[in-house]
Amino acid sequence: MSRVAKAPVVVPAGVDVKINGQVITIKGKNGELTRTLNDAVEVKHADNTLTFGPRDGYADGWAQAGTARALLNSMVIGVTEGFTKKLQLVGVGYRAAVKGNVINLSLGFSHPVDHQLPAGITAECPTQTEIVLKGADKQVIGQVAADLRAYRRPEPYKGKGVRYADEVVRTKEAKKK
């Protein structure tokens, strides 16, 4: 059995937590995040800590409590420090540029690709082949990064495409005659 739910989440100073039934709202310097938790989870807020436990009558109570603890911990980190995700563009002529909340990508297609960023996510391009995504919501950052990568996934022969900065692309050997 996982014991993730038994560890409390420490709420730092400057972070405001509101519990309204199963709806949790966490507000900090990087914004405000809201999440609705499963009915099997009971959350208590006391002494700048959030504690989690199962409600009676639910078979998966501890599992749902562990999930809720991990999600709320990510929310607290997001509103205090924020999350970043770095992407690299590998390939001749592959470029990225940010204009407002739109990322313009040149990925070898006959047309440029414009990707609209959701609210709360910012992007910057330190170089033409790097994209840095920043925001408070870990799930949204990961989804935007996955959407950008899906436009041109790294291919296995030369490794060209959009990849995460920490991703290792395994390359295949070319066909021999």
UniProtKB/Swiss-Prot annotation:
Gene3D superfamilies: Ribosomal protein L6, alpha-beta domain. The keyword Lipoprotein does not apply. GO terms for cellular component: cytoplasm; cytosol; cytosolic large ribosomal subunit. The modification N6-acetyllysine is found at K44. This protein binds directly to at least 2 domains of the 23S ribosomal RNA, thus is important in its secondary structure. It is located near the subunit interface in the base of the L7/L12 stalk, and near the tRNA binding site of the peptidyltransferase center. NCBIfam families: L6_bact. Part of the 50S ribosomal subunit. This is Large ribosomal subunit protein uL6. It comes from Escherichia coli (strain K12). The lineage of its organism: Bacteria, Pseudomonadati, Pseudomonadota, Gammaproteobacteria, Enterobacterales.
